[in-house]
Amino acid sequence: MSVTDRTTRTPQADLRLSQSSGSGMPIVMIHGSGSSRAVFARQFDSPLADAHRLIAFDLPGHGDSSDARDPAATYTITGLAQTTARLLDALNIGHAIIFGWSLGGHVAIELASFHHAVNGLVLTGAPPVSRGPLGMLRGFHANWDMLLTSKKVYSERDIERFEAFCFGGSASPSFREAIRRTDGRLRSGVAFGMFAGKGADQKQVVENAPFPVAVINGEHDPLVRLSYFETVAYASLWERCHVISGAGHAPFWEKPDLFNPLLSRFAEKVVKQSAVMPVRRTEAG
């Protein structure tokens, strides 16, 4: 298996991405706030990369991608989803499994509300909440560290706290630098947009999804309320809401030996179902 890196220009930003040489259905992986595509290293270093075309990219304002050309328009859930859609189109991806972690999960849900390529959705650390502050409060824990997700400028202490919040003691040394590099305007823009109720009603998108939806969370996730996921009336939930024992907010990084087989099994399900599903039409661009 080989991994190639490239930069793709979109109207929103220049996006740096990595992709494996696997020939199976693409799995597009979207990282969380303050992270980068490097967080999916343990999926690339697994049989998944041989079985599927794994694609991970740095969101605008993150990693090796450029900052947004128009921060006000791009640094929202809708703007990031539109950026992802442009990338899929540039890569000629007509069908894919979208795996979104944390912020990336919310971007994935928004993308699924309008883009025809989404054949399956994997959500980790990303509760599909209704619009506005009440929906947010139902899906997320209310604690002081959550305020970091909307803070524009980080001190070194903030960087340390956010790293521990997301990864506990499991972080790679490079993860702290990824947090430091992040364009803080994204944090404030995304948080404002979500509390203002902008974008799709994520709960409705997931409840009405015509494709399989996998929910895989960490047992000790400090950000999200695991009980909330059980209140969602999924039309197409795969198996059940899976919980990775002993993991926190990033179970795919902390416990890849448990996470990767679930992702592989879900992908097999999506491939089989996609063979008989009608082609979805793009509702918006």
Mark where each language-model region is.
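Conserved loop-alpha-helix segment in the C-terminal half of the alpha/beta-hydrolase fold
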Residues: 47, 210-247, 253, 258
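Active-site loop/oxyanion-hole signature of alpha/beta-hydrolase fold enzymes
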Residues: 55-99, 261
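Flexible "cap/lid" loop of the alpha/beta hydrolase fold
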Residues: 110-150
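Glycine-rich nucleophile elbow surrounding the catalytic serine of serine-hydrolase chemistry
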Residues: 100-110
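Conserved HGGG/HGGXW glycine-rich cap/lid loop of the alpha/beta-hydrolase fold
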Residues: 13-67
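Catalytic active-site module of serine/aspartate enzymes centered on a nucleophile-bearing elbow/loop
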Residues: 237-285
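Conserved alpha/beta-hydrolase catalytic His-Asp/Glu region
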Residues: 132-134, 152-207
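Conserved alpha/beta-hydrolase "nucleophile elbow" surrounding the catalytic nucleophile
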Residues: 31-33, 96, 100-102
